[in-house]
Structures are given as C-alpha cells and as structure tokens.
Amino acid sequence: MIEFELTDEQRLIRETAGEFSDRELAPRARENDRNEHFDTELVQKMAEMGFLGAIVPEEYGGRGVDYLTYGLIVEEVGRNDSAMRTVISVVTSLVCSSIVRWGTEEHKQEWLPQLCSGEALGCFGLTEPDTGSDAANLKTRAEKIDGGWRLNGGKMWISLGNYSKLAMIFAQTDPEKKHKGLACFLVPTDSSGFSSQEIHGKLGLKGSDTAELSLDGVEVPDGALMGEVGDGFKIAMSALDSGRYSVAAGCVGICQASLDASVAYAKERTQFDRPIASFQLVQEMLADMVVQTQAARGLVWRAGWLKDTGKPNTTETSIAKLYATEAAVDCANKAIQVHGGSGYVDDYPVERYLRDARVTTLYEGTSQIQKLIIARSVTGINALVP
C-alpha cells in the first residue's frame, strides 16, 4: 500500500522549520529585499537549526535527515524567504551533497563541518558568461602544473560567490574531449588570483548574494581535484539533480504562501458589500492554486522518496522541478490578481513571491532543459547530442 503520511519525526521537523521561518525569516524578508541585503545573521541562525547540513551525515557535522525530510525544511523556508532558501539549496544540495558523494575523506573532514556549522559558505562555479545549459563547453581552463593545477577563466551568476570560503570550480582540461575533459576543483576563495564582484539589479532574490567570479592563474594542489579528470560533468549533473529537488521544494513553499495570502486577503477584502472570496472567479483562482500546490508537493515528495530508496530519480526530479517552478510563478501571479492593486506594491508579499519565483524556471536547468530530460526518458533520444 502506498503511504502518504509523514512520520512523527518528519511532522515535528516540518513544524519546527515552519515556526522558525515565521519567527525569524518573515519579519526581515521585505527589508532585505528592498535593500538588496544579504542577511548573514539569518544564515547563521539557519546553520544553528541544522538546515545547512541537513542531509550531511552526522559524523561530518550534519543532521543526517533523508531527502523527503530535507524537502519539508526547504519548503518551509521557501514559504517566507526564497533568498534564504537559496542559501540552503546552494550550500546543502549543490556543494555538500557533491563533497559527500565525490570528495575524498580529507575533503569531507576539512569542509563539511565548516559548511554545516555556517563557519564557511560554499558556491557552485559552473555557469559562465557564455556558457549556461551547454556545460560541456566551458571556457574556464585547468592546466596541469607540477604538483597541481592552474585555473584561468570566469564564472557568472554564482549564488553566494562573494561570501563563500569555498568554490566548486568546473574547468576544462582538454577542449577536444568535451564533457570527458571536465574536472571539478575545490578552490579556497582566498587563493591568489581568485576574485569576485557583486551583481546588482536583479528582478528577484534581491536578498541573496550573486557574483561574477574571476580566476586569474589560480593555483591549487592535486588534492583539490574532486573525483578524477573527466568526472566533472558527472559531478555537475549529480549536483544539479540534488539542487533541482531543493528548488522544487522551495517553490512548493511559494505556492503555499501565495495561496495562504490570497485566501486571507479574499476573505477580508469586501466589494459590493461582500467578501471577494465569495465571487466565483476569485474562487476559481483559489481552487487552481490549491490544485497546483498539492500537485507540486506530491511530485516533490515522490522525487524525495525515490532518492531515499535509492531508485532512479533523475526524470522524476526534473518533473518535480518543471512543474513546481512553473506552478510557483503562476500561483504568485494569481495571488497578485486576487490582491488587485494592493498586490502590485510591497506592502503585501505577493509581488516578491512572483519576482523570486521567476528565476527558478531559469537556474539549475531551465524549464526547457527539464522538458528535454523528461522527453529523453520516453524516447531514448538525447536532443542535446547531434
């Protein structure tokens, strides 16, 4: 029999994360968004709650929860503050999960306790100014030198890049080998030749740090290589698989927040001597949001369950990411419609929900990339390979 009930422990963790989100994140979200302020105090508080190392084994300083439980935490954080949810997605899903799976014991001992405790943040250096979805054609180069590697290149749209102590840098060792020449390096950001620059003027996630990274002759030892030369593409894809799950879970939070705000406003706002919640077309929008929220949550839970049981889940994770991100955009847009003119200003949070949701259809694989992954599973044809 299929079981749709959470365990007592999962319900408790979800409730605790929700209370934290309401108490700590919600009161600051608007001002941090207005001021483009990356709130490091909130980051530290999330670390103290165990959010940054939620899926990391306890022996390395993490909480050791399963993916379904992790998704519950991410949803509750995303319900109030997508900028802070981004911190969890990057540190936990992209960086920590990669080190757990691909790192040496030395990598794990050196970095995981720092990342879980918030002593250090990490960033994921894959995207470049001229390379987004086409990860096999990176321009950043890794040149073998005596005892190590020399890195040259640049990375773009890197979340947490200005605040990270550790950067996962993907570089090409041999352009003729395409994806088989990619390598992944763990690079301390205080390395000579490493620099970052803030990116401002974003539509959403204004409370999240975003950077452009430059690597000008950055030298790292052989021990900085994660996996083997040629493993970089596999490392990137496995990290993105984990990251897509957390983005989807966070978008369920946006859907729920949009629904909650809309129901509250529609029951309070009166026109023609009655609450607008009684109008059939408003109820239609609310009903659509209920369906989208529950459907997105169900897809995320299924992807999490597959991850926890060790079953193949790449397609299901892409399905969850595609549906939940598009649903978040639509639910937030409907929430603005329910709020009318009030939804167009930041006195209410729904306009921020829409701005924050929009980027989720772009990063960690665009909606179009997710559709290609999903279609590949039924056709057996990779649309990205000539």
Question: What are the functions of these language-model segments?
Answer:
Residues 118-126:
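A short, Trp-centered hydrophobic/proline-enriched beta-strand micro-motif
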Residues 115, 130-133, 157-160, 174-176, ...:
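Short Gly/Pro-enriched turn/cap motifs at secondary-structure boundaries
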Residues 50, 74-78, 171, 187-192, ...:
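Short Ser/Thr-interspersed hydrophobic loop/turn segments at strand-loop and sheet-helix junctions
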Residues 1-90, 102-107, 114-119, 132-135, ...:
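Alpha-helical interface subdomain recognition
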Residues 96-102, 124, 176:
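Flexible, glycine-rich active-site loops centered on histidine and acidic residues
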Residues 137, 190-219:
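Flexible, small-/acidic-enriched active-site or ligand-binding loops
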Residues 148, 152-196:
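A short core secondary-structure module
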Residues 65, 134-136, 160-165, 178-181, ...:
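Short glycine/proline-enriched turns and hinge-like loops at secondary-structure junctions
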